[in-house]
Structure formats: C-alpha cells, structure tokens
Amino acid sequence: MASFRRFRLLSPLKPCVTFGRMLYTRIDKDGLTMLAGHLAYVSLLSLVPLITVIFALFAAFPMFAEISIKLKAFIFANFMPATGDIIQNYLEQFVANSNRMTVVGTCGLIVTALLLIYSVDSVLNIIWRSKIQRSLVFSFAVYWMVLTLGPILVGASMVISSYLLSLHWLAHARVDSMIDEILRVFPLLISWVSFWLLYSVVPTVRVPARDALIGALVAALLFELGKKGFAMYITLFPSYQLIYGVLAVIPILFLWVYWSWCIVLLGAEITVTLGEYRAERHHAKSVITQSPEM
C-alpha cells in the first residue's frame, strides 16, 4: 500500500524527470560549456568592433544622438553587472581610438563584428543538428541586416518611448507608478524577446513558436538571476580584485560573458529538447495504441 502511494506521488514528476534526463544527455553530448567558451572568446574579440559599428550607425542619424547616450547607460547598467562603469569607460576609449582608423581598418572592424554573428549562427545550428546551409549571399544579407537594422530598431523604439513619456497625460501619479513597474521588468522583456527571436530565426530548421517562447523565458529569467548573483559574487568575494588589481576587469568581463553564453545555449537546449520530448511521447502513445491490435 505504501509503495502504491509513493508511486502515485511520484507519477506526476515522471515527465519532469524524463525531460531532465533528455536535457542533461543533450547538454553533455553537445558540450555546452565548450561551445559557450568558444562564443565567449569570439565575443571578447568582436566586442569593440561590434559596439563601434552600432554606435557609428547611431551617429549617422541625428535623431538618435541623445538616445545613443541613454542606450549606452541602459546596456551597461542592465547587461553588465558590478563592473559596468569601468568596462564602459574602457570601451568608450577603444571606440574613440577606432574612429581614427583607415577604410581598410574599418572594413576589418565590420568583418570582425560579423564574425560573432556567424559564430552564434554556427553554434545554434550545431545544437539543432541542422545540416541545412544557407547560401553565402543570403547569410551575409541576414548578418548585415541584424548588424544594421537591429540597433536602428532599438533606437527607434527608445525614441518612441521617450516621446510617449514626455506627454502631459502621463504625469498622473497612478500612471507614473505603472510606468515604474513596467520599466523595472523592461530588461526581462527585452531579454525574453531577444532570446525568442534568436531561437526562432537563427536555426535553419523550423522551430515551434511555443518551444522558443518557453526556452527564451527560462533563459531570460536565468539571465536576470545571473546578473544579481554575479554582482553579489563580485561584491562579497572580491578575489579577482585582490589578485589582478586594476586588470581585474578583464577576467571579470570574460567570466560574465562566458556565463551569459552558458545561459543562452541552455535556453536553446531546452527549446530543442521540448520538441524531442513531445515527439518521443507521441511515439510512445502510438506504440501503446497499436500493441492491442498486434
């Protein structure tokens, strides 16, 4: 009787256990930590070129001049915890130095920035086991569109938001408190939408929208928790500052970028595993329904 009760208690957890096993097997087989390390290395190599290209695009549009300053502050405050101010100062110096580069050097910066997008594309298609390859021209067009239209769309959305916030009817106390709550969860929403687009658009196979939304939500929540946990770790255990001194920002930045890519790839693995788990359950049900006839 006790064993029967235990079975009834554990039976609702069985799907979760099965899914967890499938997810762990997939993560282990794909070598998630190695893929994250590869992307972290490429990200650090491409970070300055990518930021240079993005803010050069903002500089080309006068309407984005003020927004680019706000966007910088928003990115470093919400996506680079603990050492955002220091990293921002260094990156702004690097970007200022890159403005004196020649045409050949500028082309090299653009190619290096595109290298990061290509690496993300390759890694995600490895996770999805996709053998379909885009043509070189189509791939370049997609990468260039992401590199150029992405920042412009973000800037346009911030321009619209700033305009709406400046309207007089929003000065009401209740509306102000509502806006504060929305702004508090805004980084989470941006992460969720960004991850959803990443998991939906980048793979060369069809990805169910529901699976991509679930995987993106898990990744966004882990990313927000990771920011707080990482900031707490740097504050409470300042071992990097004690060992490296002024240069501590380098390993701290690398560690954060690596941790971020682990979260992004975990969300991708969850998205893929959801589809595989559903297919396996469908196959098991079809076998059970066919067995009495045999």
UniProtKB/Swiss-Prot annotation:
Q: How does it sit in the membrane?
A: Multi-pass membrane protein
Keyword Iron attached = no
Q: Which residue windows are transmembrane per the record?
A: 44-64, 67-87, 108-128, 136-156, 185-205, 212-232, 246-266
Query: Please, which domain of life does this record's source organism belong to?
Result: Bacteria
Q: Which NCBIfam families match?
A: PRK01637.1, yihY_not_rbn
| GO CC aspect terms | plasma membrane
Family assignment from sequence similarity: Belongs to the UPF0761 family.
Query: What keywords tag this UniProt record?
Result: Cell inner membrane, Cell membrane, Membrane, Transmembrane, Transmembrane helix
Q: Give the source lineage, highest ranks first.
A: Bacteria, Pseudomonadati, Pseudomonadota, Gammaproteobacteria, Enterobacterales
> Per the annotation, which location comes first and is thus the protein's main one?
membrane
InterPro entries tied to this protein = UPF0761_bac, Virul_fac_BrkB
Protein name (database record): UPF0761 membrane protein YpsIP31758_0030
Extract the Pfam families matched here.
Virul_fac_BrkB (PF03631)
Kindly list the places in or outside the cell where this protein is found, as annotated in its UniProt entry. Answer: Cell inner membrane
